[in-house]
């Protein structure tokens, strides 16, 4: 991904750095409208995810995470921007006339060919089961056979195949977690593109609001009814031994994963902080 630096003509563009990738014409049969976001509220209208709301209207692109066009070669026709994710997507024209979007693998260019199947070459962008050589870089990894890729889908994400034993493969995920997955599940070879997404600088607050992200307010400047850290005269301490969430739970060190999940035995090493 190429980063475009703005010329410092105004204060808002002084520190701006954005992706210079050109948008392409989206195929109408691969997009559909989606309802406006819930602004971080649940069905009862209670905020469950803070600092969300507003933003520009979006059309959802149908992404092929299953890669179930078996043994049919496809050609990359265009690389496009997707407002619903930080990774880019590419339009694939298959030999049987099918057209689909997939996540853009890093290094793939327009004109490259890809294919998915059980006996396909281990090449960037190809999708095949986890019966691959050790050390292979992977993304868009299935957890349940046939459900489609669920792991390592963000921009720049890459997992590594580190061991194989019996019917299971051991993967090291981008978070640092090491877990077992059935070697019949499929994955895509390579790394997700748009690696330099963290180098972008929006340059102004309005660009952040276009993305549907609202300002983040510190709990210490709120009222006691809104946050455990709130209240006091002037600049007051939080009044607690340890920081807390808006709901009163410990903010630091508390594990958020549910206990006794079915996949507990599949995780060999939990993610690194």
UniProtKB/Swiss-Prot annotation:
Part of the 50S ribosomal subunit. It is found in: Plastid, Chloroplast. Disulfide bonds: none annotated. Keywords: Chloroplast, Plastid, Ribonucleoprotein, Ribosomal protein. It comes from Oenothera argillicola (Appalachian evening primrose). GO terms for molecular function: rRNA binding; structural constituent of ribosome; transferase activity. GO terms for biological process: mitochondrial translation. Residues 1-23, 223-273 are annotated as: Disordered. This is Large ribosomal subunit protein uL2cz/uL2cy.
């Amino acid at each position: 991904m190429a980063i475009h630096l703005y010329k410092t003509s105004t204060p808002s563009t002084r520190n701006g750095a954005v992706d210079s990738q050109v948008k392409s014409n989206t195929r109408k049969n691969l997009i559909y409208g989606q309802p406006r976001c819930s602004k971080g509220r649940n069905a009862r209208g209670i905020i469950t995810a803070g600092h969300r709301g507003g933003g520009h209207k979006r059309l959802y692109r149908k992404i092929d995470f299953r890669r179930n066009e078996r043994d049919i070669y496809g050609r990359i026709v265009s690389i496009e921007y997707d407002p619903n994710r930080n990774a880019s997507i590419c339009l694939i024209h298959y030999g049987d006339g099918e057209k689909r979007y997939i996540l853009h693998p890093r290094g793939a260019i327009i004109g490259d060919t890809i294919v998915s199947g059980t006996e396909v070459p281990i090449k960037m962008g190809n999708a095949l089961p986890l019966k691959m050589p050790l050390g292979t870089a992977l993304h868009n990894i299935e957890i349940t056979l046939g459900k489609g890729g669920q792991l390592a889908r963000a921009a720049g994400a890459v997992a590594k195949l580190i061991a194989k034993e019996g019917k299971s493969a051991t993967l090291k995920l981008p978070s640092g977690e090491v877990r077992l997955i059935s070697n019949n599940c499929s994955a895509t070879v390579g790394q997700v593109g748009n690696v330099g997404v963290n180098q972008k600088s929006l340059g102004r607050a309005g660009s952040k609001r276009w993305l549907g992200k609202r300002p983040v307010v510190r709990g210490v400047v709120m009222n006691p009814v809104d946050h455990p850290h709130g209240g006091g005269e002037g600049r007051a301490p939080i009044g607690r031994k340890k920081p807390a969430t808006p709901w009163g739970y410990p903010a630091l060190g508390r594990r958020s994963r549910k206990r006794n999940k079915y996949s507990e035995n599949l995780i060999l090493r939990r993610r690194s902080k």
